[in-house]
Curated annotation (Swiss-Prot):
This is Homoserine O-acetyltransferase. GO terms for cellular component: cytoplasm. Its EC number is 2.3.1.31. Pfam families: Abhydrolase_1. Residues 43-346 form the AB hydrolase-1 domain. Homodimer. The active site is at S145 (nucleophile), D307, H340. Belongs to the AB hydrolase superfamily. MetX family. InterPro entries: AB_hydrolase_1 (IPR000073), AB_hydrolase_fold (IPR029058), HAT_MetX-like (IPR008220). It catalyses: L-homoserine + acetyl-CoA = O-acetyl-L-homoserine + CoA. Substrate binds at R212, D341.
Amino acid sequence: MTLQQKELFQKSPLLLENGETLSPVLVGYETYGTLSASRDNCILLEHALTGTAHAAKHFESDAPGWWDDYIGPGKTIDTDKYFLVCTNVFGGCSGTTGPSSINPKTGEPFRLQFPGFSIKDIIKVQRELLEQLGVTRIVSVIGGSMGGMQATEWAIDYADITDSIINIASPLAAGPDAIGYNLIMRMAILNDPDFNGGNYVGQPEGGLATARMVGMMTYRTSELFSKRFERFTVAESSPAAFSKEHFQIESYLQYQGDTFVERFDANSYLYLTKAIDLFDVTAPAKDDLPAFAKIKIPYLLIGITTDQLFRIHDLRRGYELLKEWDVPVTYHEVASEYGHDAFLVEKEVPKFEPLIRSFLSNLPVKSI
C-alpha cells in the first residue's frame, strides 16, 4: 500500500490556533503493518521539515524511504507487531493541503492566502486522520527534527490516547541559531524576483536553491565537510568564474539546491520554517505553567552532540526542564560527524536503533 489520501474536516472546519478555519483538508499518508483488533498497536511517525510520508519501501522495487532501516518485519518498528502511520504534514506539498493546494473559494492555489499555522495545528490534523482510521491508542509518536516537535506536542495535547514519545534532535523551543538560519533562508526566497509575492509560475529557483544550501550547512558538520571535500576543486574549473563551481563543496551545495527545487514548494518552505520558529512548549499555557508540564507519559529524548541546527545545550536544557517537572524522561546523546541529519543516515543506525528499540520494549505492558 503506497500513498493514500483522506479528506477531513468536511462538515466541521479545522479550527487553527490563530482562530482561522479551513475546510476541507486533504491528508496524504502511508501505512505499514496491520491495525490490531483492539486498535491500539499504532505508532505514528513524524517526518522532518522536507520529508514525506514515504518512510519505507512497501515492496522490493518501491522507491527507498527515509527510514527503511528502522521499519519492517523484525526491525525496530516491527510491522508484524505495530501498525505504523506516517503522514505528509499539513502545510506541506506532498499530498496534504498546503499553500500550493487549490482554494475551493477561488479555484486558484492558496499561495500566501493560506492561513498561518503552528505545530499544534499540524498534529490536530493527524489526530483527526487517526480517528478516521479507527486508531484508539498510540503506542508511541516518533519524530526527528521538526518531527520531534510534533511528537512533543502530541504528549501535551493528546496524552489521553498516547502512551509514549520519542523525540530525536529537537528542543523544547526553537533556539536563536535555528531562528536565524530560518530567517536567512526565507529572505533568500522572498528576495528572489521570481517569487512575485508568492504568485510565482514554476518556482523561485534561485532563492529556494539558496535556502536549501544554507540548510545543508546546518544539517551536517564541518568535520564531515573537511573529510569529504577539504579544498578539492572541480576538474577544469576556473577560480575566477563566479557562475561556475570551483570547489567541490560548491558543486555539492549547488547540486543539493538544484534537486531540491524539483520536489519542494517555496511557499510551503516559508510556512513550515515559521512554524518551527514559533514552536515553544516552555512558554506558559492558560494555567500559567509551561506547556510541557502536562507531559506525564514516558519520553525518550535523544540529542546529537554535533548538531549545528538544534544545539546540544538546548537539548540538555530541555532534559533538565523535563526532569524538574517530573516528566518520566530518558535522555541519551549521540556523537556523529553527520550532525543534525545523523538519524537519517544509514551508517549511523547502530547508534540510534538500540536506544529506540530498548525504549519501545520497556514500555508498560498496556502499551505493547
